[in-house]
């Protein structure tokens, strides 16, 4: 569903059996309709107009999540995503990455293009020490 000028995700909210969805390069602002897609394992929301991914908090089966090139400022919604392995949240408005510290399956995270705080940069070093591949500004 990439590059289709999609704005309204309401029709997709009924696809509760879907486990892989790519919605990159659209005009999405509201992800609330995706909140029931709890079987989702891989989700691409890159290059949209999203500010809040909070409605995804119950998508705890996610293993790969890409939302680069949006306007997201908080990672709090990933706190319970224990299966999340790969996260691309580059080019957003993220300053705090502390929710990533409690994700045991995380192997790769892309953070470049975010206004990371000094504390977030220290957290990135902690992730690297744990063996996570971190792509971030120095």
Which residues does each PLM region occupy?
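Concave beta-strand-loop units of leucine-rich repeat
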Residues: 1-7, 11-95, 99-122, 128-138
């Amino acid at each position: 569903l990439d590059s289709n000028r999609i704005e309204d995700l309401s029709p997709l909210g009924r696809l509760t059996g879907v486990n892989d969805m790519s919605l990159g390069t659209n005009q999405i602002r509201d992800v609330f309709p995706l909140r029931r897609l709890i079987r989702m394992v891989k989700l691409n929301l890159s290059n949209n107009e999203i500010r809040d991914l909070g409605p995804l908090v119950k998508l705890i089966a996610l293993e790969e999540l890409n939302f680069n090139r949006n306007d997201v400022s908080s990672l709090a919604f990933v706190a319970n995503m224990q299966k999340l392995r790969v996260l691309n949240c580059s080019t957003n408005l993220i300053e705090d990455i502390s929710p990533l510290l409690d994700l045991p399956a995380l192997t790769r995270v892309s953070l470049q293009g975010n206004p990371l705080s000094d504390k977030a940069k220290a957290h990135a070093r902690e992730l690297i020490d744990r063996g996570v591949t971190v792509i971030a500004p120095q």
